[in-house]
């Protein structure tokens, strides 16, 4: 099993798809890494040689990935909340921050519906 950037890459997957198991590496970046290393997208991870894996590790090391990327994202959101801007306020409240409607919809961001309060006296 190939281990790149502290992540076990599934051996039965194609190299392009397997690289997307790393947080911060999507299909586009995985293709660029494969191109830079001279590896076919369709080559299975289990068929990669040690030299090819080393080339991939060198390419992946150039990007911000995994823990560093997660930490950076968290710090950016925390900074928005600290300065009190609109986006930070929406993050704090758990609401969408890009102008979507919230009267209906937005269930993913708001979570499951809360039971309606009855108006009995």
From Swiss-Prot:
The keyword Lipid biosynthesis does not apply. One of its GO terms (cellular component) is cytosol. InterPro entries: Rbsml_uS13_C, Ribosomal_uS13, Ribosomal_uS13-like_H2TH, Ribosomal_uS13_bac-type, Ribosomal_uS13_CS. It comes from the Bacteria. PANTHER family: 30S RIBOSOMAL PROTEIN S13/40S RIBOSOMAL PROTEIN S18, SMALL RIBOSOMAL SUBUNIT PROTEIN US13M. Part of the 30S ribosomal subunit. Forms a loose heterodimer with protein S19. Forms two bridges to the 50S subunit in the 70S ribosome. Located at the top of the head of the 30S subunit, it contacts several helices of the 16S rRNA. In the 70S ribosome it contacts the 23S rRNA (bridge B1a) and protein L5 of the 50S subunit (bridge B1b), connecting the 2 subunits; these bridges are implicated in subunit movement. Contacts the tRNAs in the A and P-sites. NCBIfam families: uS13_bact. This is Small ribosomal subunit protein uS13. It comes from Albidiferax ferrireducens (strain ATCC BAA-621 / DSM 15236 / T118) (Rhodoferax ferrireducens).
């Amino acid at each position: 099993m190939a281990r790149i950037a502290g992540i076990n890459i599934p051996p039965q997957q194609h190299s392009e798809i397997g690289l997307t198991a790393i947080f911060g590496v999507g299909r586009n970046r995985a293709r660029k890494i494969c191109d830079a290393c001279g590896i076919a997208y369709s080559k299975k991870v289990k068929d990669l040689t040690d030299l090819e894996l080393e080339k991939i590790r060198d390419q992946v090391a150039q990007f911000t990935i995994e823990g560093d990327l997660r930490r950076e994202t968290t710090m950016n959101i925390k900074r928005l909340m600290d300065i009190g801007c609109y986006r930070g306020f929406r993050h704090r409240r758990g609401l969408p921050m890009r102008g979507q409607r919230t009267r209906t919809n937005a269930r993913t961001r708001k979570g499951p519906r809360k039971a309606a309060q009855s108006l009995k006296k």
